[in-house]
Amino acid sequence: MIGILLLIGICVAVTVAILYTLYNKIKNPQNPNPSPNLNSPPPETRNTKFVNNLEKDHISSLYNLVKSSA
């Protein structure tokens, strides 16, 4: 009997926690554009630098491949 009540209590607690989380997400949506951290560059800059680096490496390796095969 105590085990059943404990199980029901756990199920109710989990259900309430899930509903509370969903309610807070709907009521207070996260800001899609958070204020930038002044100590780090914005993510776009870091991603662009990374992609540009890969692009340069890729182009130079293709150039070396064509140059060596000719």
Curated annotation (Swiss-Prot):
Residues 31-44 have a biased composition (Pro residues). Essential for the encapsidation of DNA into immature virions (IV) and the subsequent maturation of IV into mature virions (MV). It holds the Pfam family Chordopox_A13L. Residues 27-49 are annotated as: Disordered. One of its GO terms (cellular component) is virion membrane. It comes from Monkeypox virus. The lineage of its organism: Viruses, Varidnaviria, Bamfordvirae, Nucleocytoviricota, Pokkesviricetes. This is Virion membrane protein OPG139. The gene is OPG139. The chain crosses the membrane at residues 2-22. Its main location: virion. It is found in: Virion membrane. Residues 23-68 are virion surface.
